[in-house]
């Protein structure tokens, strides 16, 4: 099994938005992933949107300012496909 984790600033000059990425693979299969857009608001990093495989299935969480989370399941997509969709959405 291999793992990869990194952070990319989406606005390198201001450094107020970043893309956090983690994925694990076995052979040629993505077995787990977690990626999210985070924004620096009020002296803290806050997740805005997250794609991951928590709860056993790939999905997207939109994290609203009032604390409410909206969840969308990607049941018809593989982990690798959902990871690609999430990367395209965030970056």
Describe the role of every protein-language-model region:
Residues 67-91:
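Acidic, low-complexity intrinsically disordered segments
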């Amino acid at each position: 099994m291999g793992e990869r984790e990194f952070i990319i600033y989406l606005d390198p000059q201001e450094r107020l938005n970043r893309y956090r990425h983690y994925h694990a693979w076995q052979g040629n299969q993505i077995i787990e992933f977690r990626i999210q857009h985070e924004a620096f608001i009020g002296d803290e990093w806050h997740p805005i949107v997250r794609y991951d495989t928590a709860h056993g299935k790939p999905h997207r969480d939109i994290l609203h300012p009032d604390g409410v989370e909206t969840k969308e399941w990607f049941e018809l997509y593989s982990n690798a496909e959902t990871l690609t969709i999430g990367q395209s959405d965030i970056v």
